[in-house]
Amino acid sequence: MTDTTLDDVFKEALDRYQAGEPAEDLIPVFKDICDRARKSSPAWTCLAWLYLLADKYNSALKAAQKAVKLNPQDPQARVNLAVAMLETGQKGVRKHVEIAQQIAMAIPELRDELQESFDDGLKRKPNWASLERVQAWVFDG
């Protein structure tokens, strides 16, 4: 019997997402990962994204806040937080968008990853106004 590490579980869950599995099905998996790895910013970032896709905006806000607290330099965590804030009517979105924009401009690989994430979100959830707004702010200023 093999020993499955939390990293393996995380990678498998990401693979399932990338294969098109619905966000609602993956939320419990990522919630469990976050419960077991409380300081894993990537896990919290993924959970926030899944909550956003599932229209669970208050839960997304909490998960995104945790991800940003754990890694303030993660532009995806900042984007998730900005979208969750827009969806829940919070103030202070600009600060998170500006930080994501600065990081994306400084590091081309992260810019490309962000663009892929925006594309994925709009493919899974067409006409997602908040995501479209944040995308325009990050890339067009």
Annotate each predicted stretch with a short phrase.
Residues 1-6, 139-141:
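Long, contiguous interaction/recruitment modules in multidomain scaffold/adaptor proteins
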Residues 50, 84, 121-125:
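TPR/TPR-like alpha-solenoid repeats
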Residues 42-46, 76-80, 95, 111-116:
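Alpha-solenoid helical repeat scaffolds
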Residues 10-71, 76, 87-89, 100-102:
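Alpha-helical adaptor scaffolds
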Residues 4, 39, 73, 109-113:
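Structural signature of alpha-solenoid helical repeat junctions
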Residues 83-86, 117:
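Conserved short hydrophobic patches within well-ordered secondary structure
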Residues 91-93:
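Short, charge-rich, low-complexity interaction segments located
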Residues 103-141:
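Terminal, low-structured helical/coil segments at or just beyond the last alpha-helical repeat
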